[in-house]
């Protein structure tokens, strides 16, 4: 069962879709999120990355500042700046 993911900045939605796993660099270290993860809110590390694994491929985005929100509905990456790499 995949998890719904959205990576957004104030200017645009950078990527959204279903994923098997999300890995984000937070101020506390790398955070891996699988479907069914407990809800949480984390602070993204400056100059960090977000990796989304979906269907055997990996999507990577560079992010700078912002938050990661994990709920039962999915994962939201709300970054000050974000772009696919």
UniProtKB/Swiss-Prot annotation:
One of its GO terms (molecular function) is proton-transporting ATP synthase activity, rotational mechanism. Gene3D superfamilies: F0F1 ATP synthase delta/epsilon subunit, N-terminal (2.60.15.10). It is found in: Cell membrane. The keyword Transferase does not apply. Keywords: ATP synthesis, Cell membrane, CF(1), Hydrogen ion transport, Ion transport, Membrane, Transport. The keyword Transmembrane helix does not apply. It comes from the Bacteria. Pfam families: ATP-synt_DE_N. GO terms for cellular component: plasma membrane; proton-transporting ATP synthase complex. HAMAP family: ATP_synth_epsil_bac. Produces ATP from ADP in the presence of a proton gradient across the membrane. Belongs to the ATPase epsilon chain family. This is ATP synthase epsilon chain. It comes from Frankia casuarinae (strain DSM 45818 / CECT 9043 / HFP020203 / CcI3). The lineage of its organism: Bacteria, Bacillati, Actinomycetota, Actinomycetes, Frankiales. The gene is atpC.
